């Protein structure tokens, strides 16, 4: 029996989501479009298999084939990131980070991460996250120019003396200097942990410097700029740390791994290792630069005055409207983005004074410089007259026509 026959409610809602993804423009920086091949294996019989433990050391029988699958995923991950050890079992980026903390430090130890309002992530010590409850957290941020001042980070690190420094961000548009972070970590005897969830796809294509050999441990999601399934990974070059990480993930915070997702990670890594991937990642950056340049030409303020990666962060501190207003206006025009806090924030996290925009998903659809210039100017038009609902509707129809030339999926399920 087909899903349409068995559960028409879910079938219909899934197809409505397909329509939304195809007709609208996805510009949330952390979202992307994965491969049909990735979705195909995620919907396979591999979901039936319990495989607690690791390849060759399982707590269940019948794991001979899933052992081969997980080993293949591990080997591809190691090759992709040019590292010696990889754990592909984390169910998410947040759980990967949780596993890193559990492996490297003890509850109550101090961690130093980027302030959430300056572009960091919840799992880098934010008080509302378990990382800020189980561990004592302190923060560095960006300066008024929107960039990290590494001397300031050094001063904070020497004063606070954390056991672990987290580098990586969810809304930072500039290159991260991993070598400088390692210098600082070494000066105070701390671990350096790089969370590259947002930039991993650029890193493996050579479009952003790698955290190896500087970071003791590296984590990432496998979706976002990697375009794989939703999940997490942890990498290191240190055998002893690898053992601790493995124990922290299982049996520490997870039970049976999701073998259908691990297989999908392996498929995604195969794509990431291809020459086609390098072309894609380069275009992601090029498109982001077009977006940044058009918005600045149209007199909008960008945090750090541009971008080096896949995203731009707009600041509305000089405008009457908020990030939430901008988010809603773009949404009405068929562009999905997200409100975001900015340095010098004056509004609540639910309102914000910023907007984060990314190019990975549009690039996956085939958008290049010409299309990005059109989209960027429409964004500026909308934000120049943020309450004009008629304009938003007109632009929505124009963008719908544009999107129809770049259909990425013909059906909702594979």
From Swiss-Prot:
Which parts form a coiled-coil structure per UniProt?
A: none
| Entry GO CC | cytosol
For this UniProt entry, which residues form the secretion signal?
none
Q: What does this protein do?
A: Catalyzes the reversible interconversion of serine and glycine with tetrahydrofolate (THF) serving as the one-carbon carrier. This reaction serves as the major source of one-carbon groups required for the biosynthesis of purines, thymidylate, methionine, and other important biomolecules. Also exhibits THF-independent aldolase activity toward beta-hydroxyamino acids, producing glycine and aldehydes, via a retro-aldol mechanism.
Task: Write down the species.
Answer: Campylobacter jejuni subsp. jejuni serotype O:2 (strain ATCC 700819 / NCTC 11168)
Q: Which reaction does it catalyse?
A: (6R)-5,10-methylene-5,6,7,8-tetrahydrofolate + glycine + H2O = (6S)-5,6,7,8-tetrahydrofolate + L-serine
Q: Tell me the keywords, alphabetical order.
A: Amino-acid biosynthesis, Cytoplasm, One-carbon metabolism, Pyridoxal phosphate, Transferase
Subunit structure as annotated in this protein's UniProt entry: Homodimer.
Site feature: Plays an important role in substrate specificity: 223
Cite the NCBIfam families for this sequence. PRK00011.1
Q: Which family does it belong to?
A: Belongs to the SHMT family.
Q: Recorded E.C. number(s)?
A: 2.1.2.1
Protein's cellular compartments? Cytoplasm
Please give the residue positions where the record annotates the modification N6-(pyridoxal phosphate)lysine.
224
- Which positions in this protein are listed as binding (6S)-5,6,7,8-tetrahydrofolate? 116, 120-122, 240, 348-350
GO MF terms held by the record: glycine hydroxymethyltransferase activity; pyridoxal phosphate binding
Record-given protein name: Serine hydroxymethyltransferase
Instruction: Name its co-factor(s).
Output: pyridoxal 5'-phosphate
């Amino acid at each position: 029996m087909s899903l349409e026959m068995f559960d028409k409610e879910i079938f219909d809602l899934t197809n409505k989501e397909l329509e939304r993804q195809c007709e609208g423009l996805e510009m949330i920086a952390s979202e992307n479009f994965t491969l049909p091949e990735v979705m195909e294996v995620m919907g396979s019989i591999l979901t039936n298999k319990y495989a607690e433990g690791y390849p060759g050391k399982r707590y269940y029988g019948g794991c001979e084939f899933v052992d081969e699958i997980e080993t293949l995923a591990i080997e591809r991950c190691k090759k992709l990131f040019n590292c010696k050890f990889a754990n592909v079992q984390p169910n998410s980026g947040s759980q990967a980070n949780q596993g890193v903390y559990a492996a490297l430090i003890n509850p109550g130890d101090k961690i130093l991460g980027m302030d959430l309002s300056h572009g960091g992530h919840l799992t880098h010590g934010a008080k509302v996250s378990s990382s800020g409850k189980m561990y004592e957290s302190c923060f560095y941020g960006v300066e008024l120019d929107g960039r990290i001042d590494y001397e300031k980070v050094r001063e904070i690190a020497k004063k606070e003396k954390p056991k672990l420094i987290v580098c990586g961000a969810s809304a930072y548009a500039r290159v991260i200097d991993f070598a400088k972070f390692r210098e600082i970590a070494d000066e105070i005897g701390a671990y350096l942990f790089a969370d590259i969830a947002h930039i991993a796809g650029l890193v493996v294509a050579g479009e952003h410097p790698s955290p190896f050999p500087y970071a003791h441990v590296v984590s990432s999601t496998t979706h976002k700029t990697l375009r794989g399934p939703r999940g997490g990974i942890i990498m290191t070059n240190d055998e002893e740390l690898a053992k601790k990480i493995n124990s922290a993930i299982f049996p520490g915070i997870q039970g049976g791994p999701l073998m259908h997702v691990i297989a999908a990670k392996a498929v995604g890594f195969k794509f990431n290792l291809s020459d086609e991937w390098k072309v894609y990642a380069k275009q992601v950056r090029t498109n982001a630069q077009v977006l940044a340049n058009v918005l600045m030409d149209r007199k909008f303020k960008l945090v750090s005055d541009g971008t080096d990666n896949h995203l731009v962060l707009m600041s509305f501190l000089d405008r009457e409207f908020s990030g939430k207003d901008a988010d809603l206006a773009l949404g009405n025009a068929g562009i999905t983005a997200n409100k975001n806090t900015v340095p010098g924030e004056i509004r609540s996290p639910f309102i914000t004074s910023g907007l984060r925009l990314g190019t990975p998903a549009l690039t996956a659809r085939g958008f290049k410089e010409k299309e990005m210039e059109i989209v960027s100017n429409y964004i500026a038009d909308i934000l120049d007259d943020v309450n004009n609902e008629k304009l938003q509707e007109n632009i929505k129809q124009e963008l719908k026509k544009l999107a129809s030339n770049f259909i990425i999926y013909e059906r909702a399920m594979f």
